């Protein structure tokens, strides 16, 4: 901290001393480090540094670190979305070599992940070009696909490591997961490992688990499995 002197309008007034934080550039931000160097507290501190007005902790994070066939580093956070979804606030930030470029990442980050927060840093992303150009760029396609894969891998890991905790978080993350399932074929192909289907009695099943549970006693006249669903647990 530094001690500063505040000028007074009155010539004979006693100068007032105030303390202010030193403002310095972080020469080694969290996303440039290896995941093994960071603790959960480090990730949380970085999130608060990025979004000081966000008071709820993120649900979990995804660390990006690849240098071939493209260069990409970054940290993405799954926020607790609740019912207030605002795509124009606290967006993902794009950097190039630790220099902030923009928080307009349409065409770089898949649409279904635009609700996430954090930082991506890559010198391989062309700047000042249209979204259609970005989507056609070979490096950007690979980066977008890699981000999608990392999110899917993270979901698979979370549900395997702590199924109970994952189920508790499902309502907060399902809008992202379900949007990804209908918009990204590669994500849909992986989703059978982590997408959950809640039943009216409060249980959660993956698609494979649900199929195994009902296939022998919920079939039509042709022997095909029938899945019953409701949009209103109480009214139907």
Regions flagged by a language model, labelled:
Residues 2, 6-236:
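Conserved GHKL (Bergerat-fold) ATPase module
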């Amino acid at each position: 901290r530094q001690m500063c002197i505040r000028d007074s309008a009155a010539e004979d007034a006693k100068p007032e001393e105030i303390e202010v934080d030193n403002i310095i550039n972080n020469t080694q931000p969290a996303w440039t480090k290896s995941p093994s160097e960071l603790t959960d507290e480090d990730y949380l501190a970085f999130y608060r540094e990025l979004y000081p007005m966000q008071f709820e902790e993120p649900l979990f994070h995804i660390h990006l670190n690849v240098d071939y066939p493209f260069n990409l580093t970054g940290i993405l956070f799954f926020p607790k979305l609740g019912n207030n979804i605002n795509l124009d606030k606290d967006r993902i930030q794009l950097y190039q070599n630790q220099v902030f470029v923009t928080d307009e990442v349409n065409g770089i980050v898949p649409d279904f992940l635009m609700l996430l927060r954090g930082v991506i840093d890559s010198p391989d992303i062309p700047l000042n070009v249209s979204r259609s150009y970005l989507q056609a760029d070979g490096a950007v396609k690979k980066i977008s696909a890699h981000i999608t894969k990392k999110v899917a891998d993270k979901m698979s890991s979370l549900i395997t490591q702590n199924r109970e905790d994952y189920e508790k978080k499902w309502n907060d993350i399902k809008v992202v997961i379900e949007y990804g399932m209908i918009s990204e074929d590669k994500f849909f192909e992986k989703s059978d490992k982590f997408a959950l289907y809640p039943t009216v009695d409060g249980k959660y099943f993956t698609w494979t688990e649900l199929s195994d549970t009902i296939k022998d006693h919920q079939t039509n006249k042709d022997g095909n499995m029938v899945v019953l669903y409701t949009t209103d647990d109480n009214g139907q």
